Amino acid sequence: STNRYSAIMTQAEKVIAVSDSVVQYITEHYKNCPPEDIVRIYRGISPQEFPHGYQPSAQWINQTFKDFPQLENKFLVCLPGRITRLKGHETLIELMQQLQSQYPNLHAVVVGGADPKKAAYLKEMQDNIHSKGLRDKITFVGHRSDIREWLAFSDVVLSLSNQAETFGRTTLEALSVGTPVIGWNRGGVAEILSSVYPQGLIEVDDQSALLNAVKQHIDQPRKVKPVTMFSLKEMCDQTIDLYKHVLSLD
């Protein structure tokens, strides 16, 4: 946002941006911030916390099938994120409507809680799902503390936000454990996918491209190579180096 609070944050000697898209946003909206004062340091995750090839425990899987028996023996498409109009849930519903007859084994999982203020929107979505005959095709599992397990358990993860993500950490976490991600070509998500899994990139709001990408992943499951970028260590090292540089200027 371009409020006064955000403007104050651009008055420091150096401004850290978590992606190139944030660098561009600051440059365009905060003319008083010299471009040379903006330093791009990508956010990072721990490869130890999200190891390539990670699989949930048998106990977790058994409990999940007990809680959500409709997920068993399904091709799972996961949309992570809180319940808000910004996260692209309507796009997921349309996608499932288009795919359900051709792929009866396909099931969507929405991982994310709904703030009490969003209760009306959640009901609106559920009514939409019901009217389209998709109640047994889309499962809302609510807010979860075991996001790593859900990302690894899913066959494909979607990133369909209506606005550009500043970074897209959940996209990176999914790719890190080896789950393919399909997402719009904008913001931090596009930067991650371009570097790690370019076949998951689709043009913004191109519904037919999204449909085809999901079909391709169902018909021929893809492998994600181990992620060697965007580590927590890199982020910390670059941040400390920047602090040392700023201190040396005094």
Which residues fall in each region the model found?
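A short helix/loop element that forms part of the nucleotide-sugar donor recognition site in Leloir-type
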Residues: 51-70, 125
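A charged, aromatic-enriched C-terminal amphipathic alpha-helix characteristic of glycosyltransferases
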Residues: 219-248
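Conserved acidic donor-binding segment of nucleotide-sugar-dependent glycosyltransferases
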Residues: 195-208, 214-219
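Short, structured helix-loop element that forms part of the nucleotide-activated donor/catalytic region
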Residues: 22, 109-135
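A short, active-site helix/loop in glycosyltransferases that binds the activated sugar's phosphate group
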Residues: 12-40, 45-50
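Active-site donor-binding acidic/aromatic loop of nucleotide-activated sugar
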Residues: 117-122, 135-144, 150, 201
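Conserved donor-binding/catalytic core segment of Leloir-type glycosyltransferases
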Residues: 70-87, 93-96
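Short hydrophobic beta-strand element within catalytic cores of glycosyltransferases
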Residues: 180-183
